[in-house]
A protein has these predicted regions:
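Active-site nucleotide/adenylate-binding loops and adjacent lid/helix of ATP-dependent enzymes
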Residues: 109-206, 225
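Residues that mark the start of a beta-strand
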Residues: 1-5, 153, 207
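Residue-level detector of structured alpha->beta connecting loops
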Residues: 73, 151-152, 264
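ATP-dependent carboxylate activation and anion-phosphoryl transfer catalytic cores
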Residues: 7, 237-240, 244-339
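Phosphate-binding site of ATP-dependent enzymes
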Residues: 180-259, 263, 274-275, 279-281
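ATP-binding N-terminal substructure of ATP-dependent carboxylate-amine bond-forming enzymes
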Residues: 1-104
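Short, charged, surface-exposed secondary-structure boundary motifs
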Residues: 42-44, 59-63, 108-116, 164-166, ...
């Protein structure tokens, strides 16, 4: 039996572990997970769980991971926290008997986490929306006037962020206080934003971009070192409560194939697109499982299990079920006792 470790990562890992265990009828894999949260819900999904020490990062965390793999007889390590650093040190893990399933090389992972740098390298059939990198009020003003010539509405977001934190559509008519009182989320008043930037000499790198206001597509993917093995695209409804539609658009699948090849992507990852006035635009590549991985797998392929099996035994041996296009999927919350 292979012991497989998921270290601290995003909450979607719980769904992935459950999917692996459902498919692993012969009990060939024993799943170990760890977190700094003693009450992490993911502990209920795994065969075995462990508490990570808080505050560790960088090389200190890397050394802890090496020790953990040795002490717990880990055969396959699927890293979340410090994945880029761990990817660059795979040889050290392999030397002590642990194979590491990484989405990409250390350099590529660092690139994908910085949207400004990443966007500058993209060459595919659905490029990112028009953008400018700004770090001062003067740069913001110049970029604003340049982009507004061609685009009716703009948005802003950090170059480095997760979960969409820091994203806002820029409202030219209402103040931030008015937006707050009207319950408008993810918007900010233009004049308030200007005043805020002017009060700072410099600020963290931000992307001023064309706002894409159409349907968003989240594509959960399985790759084999640059070869796209499978992709399940979910079209998100613009109306709350209508779920998501499995939509295998040719242009999305082709762009995803191109990106997989260009960046040498491997295992499970997620690519996001959104429609705008000029067509489909690339939002980002998430080098990890998405929060909607469970919904994607309802369409047929059990992506977490296929990723593990392919990495362990070779992707050429995989039998990948056909994706059920047109399926409407969704998720509901349920009550549970915490560990």
């Amino acid at each position: 039996m292979q012991r497989v470790w998921f270290n601290k990562t995003f909450s979607s890992v719980g769904a992935a572990i459950r999917l692996i265990r459902e498919a692993d009828q012969a009990s060939e894999y024993e799943i170990v997970c760890s977190s700094t949260n003693a009450h992490a819900p993911v502990f209920l999904a795994a065969h075995e769980s462990a508490l990570e020490p808080g505050g560790l990062k960088g090389l200190d965390y890397l050394e802890w991971c090496l020790d953990f793999c040795l002490a717990h007889r880990i055969g396959i390590f699927i890293p979340g926290k410090e994945a880029a650093l761990i990817s660059g040190e795979q040889a050290r893990f392999e030397a002590q008997g642990t194979r590491v399933l990484c989405v990409a090389s250390q350099d590529t992972l660092d690139l994908l986490h910085n949207k400004a740098r990443f966007y500058e390298t993209v060459v595919c059939s659905t490029p990112p929306a028009a953008f400018r990198l700004v770090e001062t009020a003067q740069q913001f003003e110049a970029a604003w006037h340049e982009l507004k010539k061609d685009h009716a509405q703009l948005c802003i977001k950090p170059s480095v962020s997760v979960y969409g934190l820091g994203f806002a559509v820029i409202d030219e008519e209402r103040s931030s206080a008015q937006l707050l009182l009207q319950g408008v989320q993810y918007h900010i008043g233009l004049e308030d934003l200007r005043r805020g930037f002017e009060a700072m000499e410099t600020f963290r790198p931000m992307l001023l971009m064309e706002y894409l206001d159409g349907h968003e597509f989240s594509v959960d993917c399985l790759g084999d070192n640059g070869r796209l093995v499978c992709a399940v695209a979910r079209k998100k409804s613009l109306v709350v409560g209508q779920g998501q539609l499995i939509d295998l658009r040719d242009d999305i699948l082709e762009a995803t194939r191109q990106l997989t090849e260009t960046y040498g992507l491997n295992g499970i990852f997620n690519v996001q697109f959104r429609e705008g006035q000029s067509g489909l635009g690339l939002l980002e590549i998430n080098p990890r499982m998405s929060g909607g991985i469970g919904m994607a797998c309802l369409a047929g392929p059990n992506l977490p299990y296929l990723a593990l099996l392919g990495f362990d035994r070779g992707f050429d041996t995989l039998v990948v079920p056909e994706v059920r296009a047109g399926l409407r999927v969704g998720e509901i919350a349920f009550a549970m006792e915490m560990p």
